[in-house]
Amino acid sequence: MTVNVDCTRAYQEAKDKGVSFSLLVLHRIVTAAAAVEEFRYRIEGDRVVCYDSLLPEATVGRADHTFSFAAFEYDPDELVFIRRAKAEMERCRPNAYWWDASYR
Protein backbone atom coordinates (compact mmCIF):
# COMPACT_ATOMS: atom_id res chain seq x y z
CA MET A 1 0.00 0.00 0.00
CA THR A 2 1.23 3.50 -0.79
CA VAL A 3 -0.30 6.70 0.52
CA ASN A 4 0.53 10.36 0.35
CA VAL A 5 1.10 11.90 3.76
CA ASP A 6 1.22 15.64 4.33
CA CYS A 7 4.26 16.17 6.57
CA THR A 8 4.17 19.96 6.47
CA ARG A 9 3.37 20.30 10.19
CA ALA A 10 5.98 17.72 11.21
CA TYR A 11 8.60 19.44 9.04
CA GLN A 12 7.84 22.80 10.63
CA GLU A 13 7.85 21.27 14.11
CA ALA A 14 11.27 19.70 13.47
CA LYS A 15 12.60 23.07 12.33
CA ASP A 16 11.09 24.83 15.36
CA LYS A 17 12.61 22.25 17.75
CA GLY A 18 15.94 22.21 15.89
CA VAL A 19 15.83 18.43 15.44
CA SER A 20 16.17 16.03 12.53
CA PHE A 21 12.98 15.78 10.49
CA SER A 22 13.70 12.16 9.56
CA LEU A 23 14.28 11.10 13.18
CA LEU A 24 11.17 12.96 14.35
CA VAL A 25 9.08 11.15 11.73
CA LEU A 26 10.77 7.81 12.47
CA HIS A 27 9.84 8.17 16.15
CA ARG A 28 6.22 8.91 15.29
CA ILE A 29 5.97 6.02 12.83
CA VAL A 30 7.43 3.57 15.35
CA THR A 31 5.16 4.89 18.10
CA ALA A 32 2.11 4.37 15.88
CA ALA A 33 3.25 0.94 14.67
CA ALA A 34 4.05 -0.29 18.18
CA ALA A 35 0.49 0.55 19.24
CA VAL A 36 -0.76 -2.17 16.86
CA GLU A 37 -0.07 -5.57 18.42
CA GLU A 38 0.07 -7.35 15.07
CA PHE A 39 3.04 -5.20 13.99
CA ARG A 40 5.00 -6.54 16.98
CA TYR A 41 4.65 -10.20 15.97
CA ARG A 42 7.74 -12.05 14.74
CA ILE A 43 8.24 -15.65 13.70
CA GLU A 44 11.08 -17.31 15.59
CA GLY A 45 11.65 -20.89 14.59
CA ASP A 46 8.25 -22.56 14.62
CA ARG A 47 6.49 -20.13 16.94
CA VAL A 48 5.05 -16.63 16.84
CA VAL A 49 6.39 -14.16 19.40
CA CYS A 50 4.83 -10.82 20.32
CA TYR A 51 7.42 -8.25 21.37
CA ASP A 52 6.74 -5.42 23.80
CA SER A 53 8.45 -2.88 21.57
CA LEU A 54 9.95 -2.35 18.13
CA LEU A 55 13.59 -1.67 17.28
CA PRO A 56 13.76 1.05 14.62
CA GLU A 57 16.70 0.95 12.22
CA ALA A 58 18.03 3.25 9.51
CA THR A 59 20.90 3.53 7.09
CA VAL A 60 23.69 6.00 7.84
CA GLY A 61 25.60 7.58 4.96
CA ARG A 62 29.38 7.81 5.06
CA ALA A 63 31.82 10.24 3.47
CA ASP A 64 33.05 7.52 1.08
CA HIS A 65 29.50 7.17 -0.36
CA THR A 66 28.87 3.82 1.32
CA PHE A 67 26.48 3.29 4.18
CA SER A 68 26.13 1.53 7.48
CA PHE A 69 23.11 0.45 9.51
CA ALA A 70 22.10 1.88 12.85
CA ALA A 71 19.56 0.44 15.28
CA PHE A 72 17.95 2.79 17.78
CA GLU A 73 16.65 1.98 21.22
CA TYR A 74 13.07 3.23 21.36
CA ASP A 75 12.15 5.78 24.00
CA PRO A 76 8.62 7.15 24.34
CA ASP A 77 10.08 10.62 24.84
CA GLU A 78 10.56 12.00 21.34
CA LEU A 79 13.48 14.28 22.18
CA VAL A 80 15.30 11.57 24.16
CA PHE A 81 14.85 9.16 21.23
CA ILE A 82 16.17 11.74 18.74
CA ARG A 83 19.19 12.60 20.91
CA ARG A 84 20.12 8.93 21.35
CA ALA A 85 19.51 8.14 17.69
CA LYS A 86 21.80 10.97 16.58
CA ALA A 87 24.53 9.68 18.90
CA GLU A 88 24.10 6.14 17.52
CA MET A 89 24.29 7.42 13.94
CA GLU A 90 27.55 9.21 14.73
CA ARG A 91 28.90 6.06 16.37
CA CYS A 92 28.02 3.95 13.31
CA ARG A 93 29.16 6.42 10.66
CA PRO A 94 32.91 5.59 10.74
CA ASN A 95 32.29 1.87 11.33
CA ALA A 96 33.91 -0.29 8.66
CA TYR A 97 31.36 -3.06 9.10
CA TRP A 98 27.97 -3.28 7.42
CA TRP A 99 26.32 -4.12 10.71
CA ASP A 100 27.53 -3.53 14.23
CA ALA A 101 25.31 -5.05 16.87
CA SER A 102 27.81 -4.55 19.69
CA TYR A 103 25.30 -2.46 21.63
CA ARG A 104 23.06 -5.50 22.20
Regions found by a protein language model. Give the residues of each.
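Acyl/amide activation-and-transfer machinery of modular secondary-metabolite enzymes
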Residues: 1-12, 53-76
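Hydrophobic "lid/gating" helix adjacent to the active-site nucleophile
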Residues: 19-56
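Small/charged-rich amphipathic helices and low-complexity linkers that mediate inter-subunit docking
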Residues: 1-19, 23, 31-34
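Helical lid/core segments from catalytic subdomains that handle acyl or acyl-like groups
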Residues: 62-104
